[in-house]
A protein has these predicted regions:
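Interhelical loop/hinge segments that connect adjacent transmembrane helices in multipass membrane
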Residues: 4, 139, 182-227, 236-237
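Interfacial/gating helices of multi-pass transporter permease domains
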Residues: 24-50, 109-110, 203-207, 211, ...
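Helix-loop interface residues and adjacent transmembrane-helix termini in multi-pass membrane transporters
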Residues: 32-35, 71, 102-105, 135, ...
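Hydrophobic alpha-helical transmembrane segments
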Residues: 109-116, 144-189, 206-207, 214, ...
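Helix-loop junctions and terminal segments of transmembrane helices
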Residues: 53-71, 132-134, 244, 248-261
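C-terminal transmembrane helix end/exit motif
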Residues: 60, 127-134, 138, 158-162, ...
Length: 261
């Protein structure tokens, strides 16, 4: 098989392996957690997902599409993502009380403040994962995704079994991001240079802007219904909706994601 075909196979394994792990973990955790736990995490994940869209900002796709991206390009995006993610986290941190008030669920205040840390962690992975995909090293991407998910699931099940409730789901999201980052660093071993170029940022943004708009609108449409349900109904109803919607869309989204890569 050619390199492109092999890469496609590994991208397929990455997405469906992750989907399979998610399915199995949901079956196990459904016996350990309550619907309102899933509802609470679903309410705040809406804001995390949309914020993550802005962190990537289409720069990952722009770097992949660019014929010969330089060290300056990669370093510029790396530093920009860090600063921007910190800014987003600060905004979310101070908006957390208002979001909790919007949903009439005080617990969300602390949940969002803690979970928001994944924005900063994820920002450190953008360039690393982009470089691996640029080199068609989808096997390494698959390892990073599946292994990080597996480790996080094991810890989450342990925490849920010991009565951590919704916090086990928060820790799961953080651990997935941490393990993914560590594995990307292990497989890629790229270190940014001490350089930042506004010219490179502008050039990449001109292409990435359209990808950003597309991703933002897609995520907004996918999550707006959950936002309304979370506001109008209880966290239990939100939890049931979140889990059913996840089961309904996960496989189709995985197929689309493989093709996009």
């Amino acid at each position: 098989m050619g390199k492109v075909t092999i890469s496609f196979v590994w991208a397929f394994i990455q997405k469906f392996g992750n989907t399979f792990l998610s399915f199995i973990s949901n079956i196990i955790l459904a016996r350990l957690l309550l619907p309102e736990d899933y509802g609470a995490i679903g309410m705040i994940m809406i804001f995390i997902v949309i914020s993550n869209t802005f962190i990537d900002g289409g720069f990952g796709s722009a770097l992949i599409q660019k014929t010969n991206p330089t060290t300056k390009d990669y370093s510029t995006i790396f530093y920009w993502n860090i600063f921007f993610s910190i800014g987003l986290y600060i905004v979310l941190y101070f908006c957390a009380p208002f979001i909790a008030s919007f949903y009439k669920l005080p617990l969300l205040n602390n949940l969002l403040k803690v979970l928001g840390v994944v924005l900063i962690i994820n920002s450190l992975s953008v360039v690393q994962s982009t470089q691996l995909r640029k080199k068609l090293k989808f096997k390494e991407c698959a390892y990073a995704t599946v292994i990080s998910s597996l480790l996080a699931v094991c810890v989450t099940v342990f925490l849920a079994y010991n009565g951590m409730g919704v916090w086990s789901l928060v820790i799961q999201q953080i651990l997935v991001s941490v393990f993914s980052l560590l594995l990307y660093l292990y497989f890629n071993k790229w270190i940014p240079s001490l350089v930042f170029s506004w010219k490179s940022l502008k050039e990449l943004f001109n292409f990435g802007f359209f990808m950003l708009c597309s991703s933002f609108l897609n995520n907004l449409c996918n999550n707006i219904q959950g936002l309304i349900i979370g506001r109008q109904f209880s966290s239990t109803v939100m939890g049931l909706y979140t889990q059913s919607a996840k089961l309904a869309t996960e496989s189709s989204n995985s197929i689309a994601s493989v093709v996009d890569q």
